Amino acid sequence: MFKSAAENYEIIRFMEHGNRWHPAMDCVQGELLIDRVRRCPEGEKEEGFGWIRQLAQQLERFHRCRSGQCYRYVNPYSVMITRDGQIMLLDLDAQSNAFVLKNMQKRAMRNHFVKPLLHIRDHTRLFADFYGFGKTVQFLMASTIPDPPLTRCESRKLYRITEKCLSEDPKRVYQ
């Protein structure tokens, strides 16, 4: 499943205490989502849906722990898959993960995964994360070959999710 030399990444792990989540920094072995998809685009459909679900949960926990603060750069370079298939967010403040911020300076990455500032509305601070999440889901759907193939109903649901994440109409946006 993993290449022979999986790398260590500093990630944000969320610990539940009562009904509150607390962030903790950890170093975990795994590979970036973009590397995993490039190396092995074929995969089970449920695995892809699981990644999308886990990414949404990780972002929700991040927002709760940080009082609605934006993660900033949700994209395939900032998401890591552990050896046991869990999705984790990289710690963008860690010096060892500076390459993520460097990759975001590339024009192709900025154009695809970062919403231009002039289009970001004041109605939500989390709009950049929703936009990045929607673009990451689009990337997964375009770059993977699910087995069995997606049904029309599943394709429509994913389209509606990404449409809401990428929409500029305040009535159609996740809040």
Stretches found by the model and what they are:
Residues 51-52:
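Activation segment signature within eukaryotic-like protein kinase domains
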Residues 18-32:
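Conserved short submotifs of the Hanks-type protein kinase catalytic core
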Residues 86-160:
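C-lobe/activation-segment region of protein kinase-like
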Residues 33-43:
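AlphaC helix of the protein kinase catalytic domain
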